[in-house]
Amino acid sequence: MKKQHDTIIVLDFGSQYNQLIARRIREFGVYSELHPHTITAEEIKAMNPKGIIFSGGPNSVYGENAFHCDEKIFELGLPIFGICYGMQLMTKHFGGKVERANHREYGKAVLKVENESKLYTNLPEEQVVWMSHGDLVTGLPEGFVVDATSESCPIAGMSNEEKQLYGVQFHPEVRHSEHGNDLIKNFVFGVCGCSEGWNMENFIEVELEKIRETVGDKKVLCALSGGVDSSVVAVLIHKAIGDQLTCIFVDHGLLRKGEAEGVMKTFSEGFHMNVIKIDARERFMKKLKGVEDPEQKRKIIGNEFIYVFDDEAAKLEGIDFLAQGTLYTDIIESGTATAQTIKSHHNVGGLPEDMQFKLIEPLNTLFKDEVRVLGSELGIPDEIVWRQPFPGPGLGIRVLGEITEEKLEIVRESDAILREEIQKAGLDREIWQYFTALPGMRSVGVMGDERTYDYTVGIRAVTSIDGMTADWARIPWDVLEKISVRIVNEVKHVNRVVYDITSKPPATIEWE
């Protein structure tokens, strides 16, 4: 990548939040890259970054499987900011003391600033932060001072300003830390001296060049679903290589109401792309029959997608690349070399080993909100750019347990009602994601003076910036009532509607 902008390097020590750090920095207009903790000091030096951030991680610095870094990184003279595990690693390196806490601290805590280092410039003396750690620093390294404390953590923040070294035991990158963004800003601008200079125009310019260099005169097959991610991928690649791109739209029977027709109209007629539609509904349902495990469903759907593309590509000439809408969040949720796996993502963990294509994933360094900005920059209509996030496995992971046509129809119809009412209420831009799910449980009800024993539909609606963390949406009661009444009255075999009020973490946004 041509770097005409300042860069902050984030070292990955296994935290599920590590890519959030890079995301927060990009929000400030400063480019940030995530790299494995095994990167060498020489490699970092060659990148000429303005500063380094050590992410958190699930391990203990004294554990057998502890992650370490090249100790020469501390000799580069660059500002370093250690978060959670990163602070503990810094402490150990400089001779301080790290011990196991009496109990794991997880959740919100009140932080008290004791020393206003550059990290805490213009921040309140007390603030709510997000803790998630099992070890803590109990003895400062020489030359360091305590910056902040909390009730359960006497050294919640530390610094050695002469060497430009900083550490915090909490997670400023998580939205629950109320002044976390300001704290990271203080490091990026106040300590590292960065200037704003990275934006989506830069990304488009670099990515178009990269796509052309990678593809050359070869042909690309794009998995087009009509969702935000695949739509942006298709338009971006089409802008780069034109008719060298062929889009395949697979109707696997797991789509939302009216989606198949909408995709063909928008991309084939609107964007004048070469789009081939494949009706694979029977093929997918046959493979998924009797399958209840969510991981197995994801793998089957991911594999079947690739096999469908293989079959179709065999009919085409010279297809070398498969384009996918894999995002940063897909990769982190599927686990990296250091991150613990939460769930397999259809764009990451579901690919067969004998796949015939080379992958091209131009969005795999972007978060969802960045993809929307990119889509707008590319001239994609708002109705697509602001479309609800929809997973590759589609309604297949919104029907919990075994998938049947009856269950799919329940989710499809109830989801259409939910989306219609949310839009009518003017909440479609306020709520980050909303959908219905079918948990597969039945309950007793009374309809028309008769006893019923039918399904329960779950509503999931969350507010978020990038999908890494999320809070349940406070939908007005009257809107929820309309949605519930319509679903129970208009969708067959449903007699109960429930609303999911769980945040992420501890839950994920999707139910499977």
UniProtKB/Swiss-Prot annotation:
SUPFAM superfamilies in UniProt: Adenine nucleotide alpha hydrolases-like, Class I glutamine amidotransferase-like, GMP synthetase C-terminal dimerisation domain
Positions with a binding annotation for ATP: S225, G226, G227, V228, D229, S230, S231
Top EC class of this enzyme: ligase
Taxonomic superkingdom: Bacteria
Keyword Transport in annotation: no
Keywords: ATP-binding, Glutamine amidotransferase, GMP biosynthesis, Ligase, Nucleotide-binding, Purine biosynthesis
Catalytic residue positions: C84, H171, E173
Pathway(s) of this molecule: Purine metabolism; GMP biosynthesis; GMP from XMP (L-Gln route): step 1/1
Domain Glutamine amidotransferase type-1: 7-197
Chain ranges of the GMPS ATP-PPase domain: 198-387
Entry GO MF terms: ATP binding; GMP synthase activity
Subunit note: Homodimer.
NCBIfam families: guaA_Cterm (TIGR00884), guaA_Nterm (TIGR00888), PRK00074.1 (NF000848)
Protein name, UniProt field: GMP synthase [glutamine-hydrolyzing]
